[in-house]
Amino acid sequence: MAQIIKFVEDRRVLMACTILSIIMIMAFRELTQYLGAPMFDTLQGGYDMTTVRDFMLIYGDAGRQDYAYATLTLDGAFPLIYGTLSIGLLLKLAAFRFLRVLAILPLFLMGLDLYENVQLFSLLMQFPDLTVEAVARASTTTQIKGMAVMAVLAALVFQLLLRIILAAYRQFNVG
């Protein structure tokens, strides 16, 4: 476990994950442009059967196939990359040892994201034979994932602000 923690805290790993995350975000933006409609996992408010059917028709057969492929490849790797980055930053920023437990949040998010990818792949491959239940489950997962993203971002901001406050306090009391 200590080796894994050392790995994710390494500056080179953090830099590589940052660069890869940026590249992947740009690729997702291009994919969205190509598809002609938003990707389902970006709809943080969720979606319903009507939205799914409308978007699937906009994507077209080729778009659905490409989206499904990207869901298994690009979007399959993305949670591992941003998860490693988030875990590394949370561990590195932890002002107190007990705050390192916040690094569990990205693990939960990564699992949710991968589960969501499986659900979306299934919807893409089963179209037009979709069920309201399958769409509702995928939508709920997307909404929960959105909340998990906010929790991870809040933990990162909290850790960073705490570091800044402690550094200012030390500077004020030393100087």
Predicted regions: what is each one?
Residues 70-91:
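Hydrophobic alpha-helical transmembrane segments
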Residues 106-112:
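Alpha-helical transmembrane segments of multi-pass membrane proteins
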Residues 11-14, 98-105:
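Membrane-interfacial loop-to-transmembrane alpha-helix junctions, especially the N-terminal start
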Residues 2-3, 165-175:
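Short, charged juxtamembrane terminal tails flanking transmembrane helices
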Residues 2-69, 128:
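Interfacial loop at the N-terminal end of multi-pass membrane proteins
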Residues 32, 87-94, 158-166:
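Membrane-water interface at transmembrane helix exits
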Residues 7-8, 91-100, 168-169:
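Membrane-interface helix-boundary motifs at transmembrane edges
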Residues 112-165:
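Alpha-helical transmembrane segments of multi-pass integral membrane proteins
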